[in-house]
Structures are given as C-alpha cells and as structure tokens.
Regions:
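Residue-level detector of anion-binding/catalytic polar loops
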Residues: 1-2, 27, 221
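Aromatic-enriched alpha-helical interface/lid elements that frame and gate functional surfaces
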Residues: 142-218, 222
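A structured beta-alpha segment of the ubiquitous adenosine-cofactor-binding alpha/beta core
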Residues: 1-23, 204
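A glycine-rich dinucleotide-binding beta-alpha-beta segment and adjacent secondary-structure elements
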Residues: 217-247
Length: 247
C-alpha cells in the first residue's frame, strides 16, 4: 500500500506515480489524498482544513441561525479525508484478495466534507432548499437540543413520542405531557417555542447532574456538555481506557 498527499502531479514528476508503480507491482494499492482531487478545474488549488470546511458546506450548517458560519472545533476536513482514505484502502485490499489486482484511490478533503453532510445534503437534494444553521437543535426532531440548567447545560435527545412521555414524567412536566400541542413529534416541532418554555421552567432549579440522573433512570438519552478535562475524568472513559500511556 502506498499513501501520498503531495500536490496533484508532484509524485508522478518524481517518478513514483500510479502508472510507474503499478507497472512494477500490479498488486499495489495506492491512495492519493489532496484538497480537491487529482483532476478537474480546482485540482491545483491549495487547501487547508478551514478552507475546505467552508467550501464543503459544513460551516453553513454549524453554529446559530443569527451568527456567522462556524467551523468545527476539530479539523474535520483533515480527519474526514484520512478516514475515507482508510476505508477505501481496506476495501481495495479485500478486492485484491479476490482478484489479485491493485487499485488507485483518489480521495479529496472536499469530497470528504460533502460525504459528511449526510442528511443535510439529502434534504437539499430532495427539496431544493439549502439547510441553515440551527444551533444544537435537530431540524425534524424535538426536544433534541442543549438546555440551560442551574449550573450549566444538558443535552437531551427525545427521539420519539414514548421517550417524550418518559421525559415529562422524569421532570414533573405533567401539563406538557398531556398538552395536545405536544402530543406527537410533528406537533412538538410546530409548537417548539411553547414546549421549550415548559422545559426551561422545569430545568431551571435543577443541576445538570440531577437532570441526567433522573433521565437515565427512565432511559431518556441525555448527557452533560463536558470540557476536555471532564471527558478524561469520566468513569466510563477511564474504564474503557480511552487514554493510554505508551512507554
């Protein structure tokens, strides 16, 4: 397997392009990772993570509706290209095991960002309307958002009507549980602002930990918004050894 991320055309000029390597070793799997692809009108452009996040649409759906477009907190443009290259290499190796043939793989940072648009891209392709940033909320499921608590914020992901009833019971929201405006997810989406008033009132006197404890008991997906130090202090993270010291 050969992996390279020179500017398009560079490795061929050095004598190690696909044609040269494949001629010597027909079984070779070669992956080229670049900003915009090996061919096409934009192939020669220079890419950095932030540039590709902007061009790939990710920033347009990240952040709040009334704020400026926002980049991910990690270099998802770089990471995405590497991940997709790894998947493609693994698939090429499986194919080689069957056919005995090598394969050339062209992965771009821009292409990776487009693939990560997932349902945002599907929504546009189905409706013709470009999705907009919506903060932490889900576009078609609610309550699915970050809510303020007595000492911070809590994430709640109420994915169906059954979970909504459990959510209301855990937080003592009996009125919201029976209000016909919130009976189904479609109703809740249509009356989101009114529902949020009930949720904010119920959560205001409770700490994040208290809310998580209540919702965990009834099986409602939830969690705190952790700082990086809090992530590594989490007992599940420690148990699964996500942090390891290598000698």
């Amino acid at each position: 397997v050969v992996v390279e991320n020179f500017s398009p055309g560079t490795i061929a000029r050095l004598g190690f392009g696909w044609d040269a390597i494949h001629a010597r070793c027909p079984k070779v799997v070669m992956a080229s990772i670049s900003g915009f692809g090996q061919t096409g009108p934009g192939a020669g452009r220079t890419a950095y993570d932030l540039v590709v996040q902007g061009m790939g649409g990710i920033m347009s759906v990240t952040g709040t509706a009334d704020g400026m477009p926002t980049k991910y907190g990690v270099p998802i443009g770089d990471i995405g290209a590497g991940m997709f290259a790894a998947y493609a290499i693994a698939a090429a190796l499986v194919r080689r095991g069957t056919t005995g043939e090598g394969q050339y793989i062209d992965v771009s940072m821009l292409g990776g960002q487009i693939a990560l648009l997932t349902y945002q891209a599907a929504s546009y392709l189905a409706t013709g309307e470009a999705p907009k940033a919506a903060g932490n909320a889900h576009s078609i499921i609610t309550p699915y958002d970050a809510f303020p608590t007595k000492d911070g914020y809590v994430i709640v992901a109420v994915g169906n009507d059954s979970l909504y009833q459990k959510f209301c019971a855990a937080l003592g929201m009996s009125e919201a549980a029976t209000d016909p405006r919130f009976a189904t997810n479609r109703d809740r989406v249509a009356n989101k602002a009114a529902m949020y008033e009930h949720i904010n009132t119920a959560m205001a006197p409770l700490t994040t930990a208290e809310i998580v404890e209540r919702l965990d008991v009834v099986g409602v997906p939830c969690g705190p918004i952790s700082r990086v130090d809090e992530v590594f202090a989490n007992e599940q993270v420690q148990f699964t050894k996500q942090r390891r010291t290598i000698q």
